[in-house]
Design a protein with these regions (language model features):
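Acidic-enriched and Gly/Ser
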Residues: 1-196
């Protein structure tokens, strides 16, 4: 199946990532359909749009918007699928719903985005565990360099768990400063974000 303007994708695994392996048992973390934090965001590309060229190829793994696989309840309490839904294993998504793609072993950001890993709090008197609005560029579209220490505007991030690491998706236009490394910066990844 091909679409003229949409990517055709299928979820990698289930629609929701709401279980965690504890020993030989599965622990259910969430049973609500409306909580976006437990929606699967990884997908496999089945086909690319036919109307234009794209960097993404069939077979690539992509990170998509949290509403793509999400189910929700309408005003009458009926469960509905997202507007991307075609059938249980097929979804149609627009290019602006894809933020990151993986070819072979490398993650690459879509144009206009980069993914930033937060750093640990350097001030021992601060109660926060991570520095606010500062991080290390992990994946980029080429505008910023991987490994750069950058600052970004407040409320401009969106949290993702990618390969067991918590990262923030930041639009390039919201990166406001590039810092020099001081040598005491350390990436921060909370234990709950790590893969089991």
């Amino acid at each position: 199946m091909k679409a003229p303007f949409d990517f055709v994708i299928e979820p990698k695994g289930n629609r929701y990532n709401n279980t965690k392996k504890v020993g030989d048992k599965d622990l259910i973390l969430n049973t609500e359909v409306f909580n976006h934090q437990f929606v699967n965001r990884e997908a496999i590309v089945k086909s690319v749009p036919t109307a234009y060229n794209t960097k993404i190829k069939p077979g690539d793994t992509v990170i998509v918007h949290h509403n793509v696989f999400r189910r929700w309840l309408d005003v009458k309490g009926r469960e509905k699928n997202s507007k991307s839904y075609f059938n249980e294993n097929t979804y149609l998504v627009k290019p602006d719903q894809i933020f990151l793609y993986k070819r072979q072993c490398d993650w690459l950001a879509m144009d206009g985005y980069c993914f930033v890993q937060p750093i640990k709090q350097r001030n021992s008197l601060d109660v926060e565990t991570e520095e606010q609005c500062i991080g290390i560029v992990k994946y980029t579209d080429g505008i910023n360099k991987t490994g750069e220490l950058v600052g970004f505007t407040p409320f401009s991030t969106y949290e993702f768990i990618i390969d067991g690491k918590r990262l923030y998706r930041v639009m390039n236009k919201f990166i406001t400063i590039k810092y020099e490394y001081q040598g005491d910066e350390e990436a921060y990844n909370p234990s709950w974000a790590q893969s089991s």
